[in-house]
């Protein structure tokens, strides 16, 4: 049965401030709680809910919890419309507004803490689970298994953009919360997601590393599948995402060995070199040393050109994409160095 009324949803929205202090009791009739954080992406959320409503698992065996990290009445009405659309044919559906703190980590924590099942399934509002997603994952969670990672499919164009290729690489990693199942007791023992991470990827990697350190029994399956279409990012997205390097510093501080093994083997020395020769060129210009300035400019052009070539390799060579790569390759090294050093200072860690 689908439980939702507009009045109930509005009350939940208004009284969500204390929700993180409450633990919902386990309901033995509900085997799995699906947590879907959302950020005002109505079309994508609608597609995700449609896919969840079509699950082959019996509706009474699972519930759906939508956590709105940007609470507004548009998302509220979209979720409530599913009651009218599905009537009593669908699973229990809960809308939960997240008044803050915000971010994927906080939203996911709000969701699993009100879940009624012992098994928590995480996906994204942009993901489309296969009809047998839940039915395929549950048997893998045997008594001795703590968590399960499923398969994420990302349809990729023959010549993707550099950003899309990077997104595919991240989703092809061994752990991603777009398709993740975990026992509630494990989440409680670990304290859930670390809400200090504003970036979803950092919070996911942190939980993954904690599970590996625990150690938890983490299993991968190719049978539980979600599809996550690659979105078209705004122009210059690769530059704006550099600010997440601040969170990378915290991740490195918490898990230095695993960070070097699984994320980045060492500092991006090429960025530091490009910034250094640019600094030499500027300083030489100020001090009227034209020969040194010219050498610095040439070295900077060579380094920036090498970065452009690397980023364009195997990606789209459309005029718009090439222009974006050229401009952002000029900006990325100094901004990357700035945000990495900002993270190192903020979290007092030697992170380069």
Spans of model-derived segments:
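N-proximal low-complexity "stem/linker" segments adjacent to membrane-targeting elements
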Residues: 2-54
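A recurrent flexible, glycine/aromatic-enriched loop bordering the glycosyltransferase active site
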Residues: 154, 166-185, 198-200, 206, ...
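Cell-envelope/extracellular polymer assembly enzymes that use nucleotide-activated donors
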Residues: 30-33, 63, 206
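Short aromatic/hydrophobic "clamp" motif used to bind/position activated sugar donors
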Residues: 120
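Glycine-rich, basic loop-to-helix element that forms the pyrophosphate-binding segment
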Residues: 95-115, 174, 178
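Conserved donor NDP-sugar-binding/catalytic core segment of glycosyltransferases
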Residues: 128-160, 229
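Acidic donor-binding segment of Leloir-type glycosyltransferases
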Residues: 50-97
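Catalytic donor/gating beta->alpha subdomain of glycosyltransferases that bind UDP-sugars
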Residues: 194, 199, 205-261
């Amino acid at each position: 049965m689908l439980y939702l009324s507009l009045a109930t949803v509005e009350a939940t929205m208004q009284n969500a401030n204390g929700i993180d202090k409450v633990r919902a009791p386990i309901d033995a009739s509900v085997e799995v709680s699906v947590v879907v954080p959302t950020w005002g992406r109505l079309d994508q959320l609608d597609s995700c809910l449609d896919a969840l409503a079509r699950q082959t698992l019996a509706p009474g065996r699972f519930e759906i919890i939508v956590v709105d990290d940007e609470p507004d009445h548009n998302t509220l009405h979209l979720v409530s419309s599913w009651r009218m659309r599905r009537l009593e044919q669908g699973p229990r559906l809960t809308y939960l507004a997240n008044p803050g703190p915000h971010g994927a980590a906080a939203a996911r924590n709000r969701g699993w803490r009100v879940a009624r099942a012992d098994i928590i399934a995480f996906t994204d509002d942009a993901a489309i689970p296969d009809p047998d997603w839940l039915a395929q994952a549950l048997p893998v969670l045997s008594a001795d298994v703590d968590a399960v990672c499923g398969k994420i499919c990302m349809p990729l164009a023959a010549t993707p953009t550099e950003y899309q290729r990077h997104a595919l690489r991240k989703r092809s990693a061994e752990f991603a919360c777009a398709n993740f199942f975990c026992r509630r007791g494990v989440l409680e023992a670990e304290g859930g997601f670390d809400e200090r991470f504003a970036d979803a990827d950092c919070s996911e990697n942190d939980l993954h590393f904690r599970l590996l350190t625990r150690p938890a029994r983490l299993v991968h399956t190719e049978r539980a599948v979600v599809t996550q279409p690659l979105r078209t990012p705004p122009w210059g997205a690769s530059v704006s995402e550099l600010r997440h390097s601040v969170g990378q510093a915290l991740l490195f501080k918490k898990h230095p060995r695993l960070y070097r093994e699984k994320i980045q083997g060492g500092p991006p020395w090429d960025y530091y070199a490009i910034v250094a020769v640019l600094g030499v060129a500027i300083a030489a210009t100020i001090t009227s040393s034209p020969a040194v300035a010219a050498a610095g400019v040439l070295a900077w052009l060579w380094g920036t050109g090498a970065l452009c070539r690397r980023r364009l390799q195997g990606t789209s060579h459309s005029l718009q994409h090439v222009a974006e790569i050229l401009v952002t390759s000029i900006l990325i090294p100094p901004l990357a160095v700035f945000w990495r050093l900002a993270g190192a200072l903020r979290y007092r860690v030697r992170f380069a």
